[in-house]
């Protein structure tokens, strides 16, 4: 049982850590492309900004879903119940 709990803790750490890393890379790419587009066509900045914020919200939502799944595995681990039964 300790092995399952330990491996679950490692999986949770990887899920949160890699999710944060992916979000950071995504925000960096998104901001860079927004600045490129704004510098190339300044008259399109309001439309690009709205689209950037929508994509940023979706990008952040993926990470929050990952954190929710990680918290589920941390506090309500379904694998421990299968070992007892």
Swiss-Prot record:
This protein's record includes keyword Cell membrane: yes
Pfam families, per database record? ATP-synt_C (PF00137)
Q: Which residues of this protein are annotated with the site description Reversibly protonated during proton transport?
A: 60
Record's keyword annotation contains DNA-binding: no
List UniProt keywords, sorted A-Z.
ATP synthesis, Cell inner membrane, Cell membrane, CF(0), Hydrogen ion transport, Ion transport, Lipid-binding, Membrane, Transmembrane, Transmembrane helix, Transport
Annotated S-S bridges: none
Top-level taxon in the UniProt lineage: Bacteria
Mind telling me which residue stretches traverse the membrane in this protein?
10-30, 53-73
Q: What does this protein do?
A: F(1)F(0) ATP synthase produces ATP from ADP in the presence of a proton or sodium gradient. F-type ATPases consist of two structural domains, F(1) containing the extramembraneous catalytic core and F(0) containing the membrane proton channel, linked together by a central stalk and a peripheral stalk. During catalysis, ATP synthesis in the catalytic domain of F(1) is coupled via a rotary mechanism of the central stalk subunits to proton translocation.
Protein family (similarity comment): Belongs to the ATPase C chain family.
Q: How does it assemble?
A: F-type ATPases have 2 components, F(1) - the catalytic core - and F(0) - the membrane proton channel. F(1) has five subunits: alpha(3), beta(3), gamma(1), delta(1), epsilon(1). F(0) has three main subunits: a(1), b(2) and c(10-14). The alpha and beta chains form an alternating ring which encloses part of the gamma chain. F(1) is attached to F(0) by a central stalk formed by the gamma and epsilon chains, while a peripheral stalk is formed by the delta and b chains.
What is the name listed in the Swiss-Prot or TrEMBL entry for this protein?
Answer: ATP synthase subunit c
Per the UniProt entry, what species is this protein from, by scientific name? Pseudomonas syringae pv. tomato (strain ATCC BAA-871 / DC3000)
Gene behind the chain: atpE
């Amino acid at each position: 049982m300790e092995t399952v709990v330990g491996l679950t803790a490692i999986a949770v750490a990887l899920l949160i850590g890699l999710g944060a890393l992916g979000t950071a890379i995504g925000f960096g790419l998104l901001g860079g492309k927004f600045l490129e587009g704004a510098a190339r066509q300044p008259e399109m900045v309001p439309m690009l900004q709205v689209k950037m914020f929508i994509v940023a919200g979706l990008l952040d939502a993926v990470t929050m879903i990952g954190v929710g799944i990680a918290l589920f595995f941390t506090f309500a681990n379904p694998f421990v119940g299968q070992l007892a039964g």
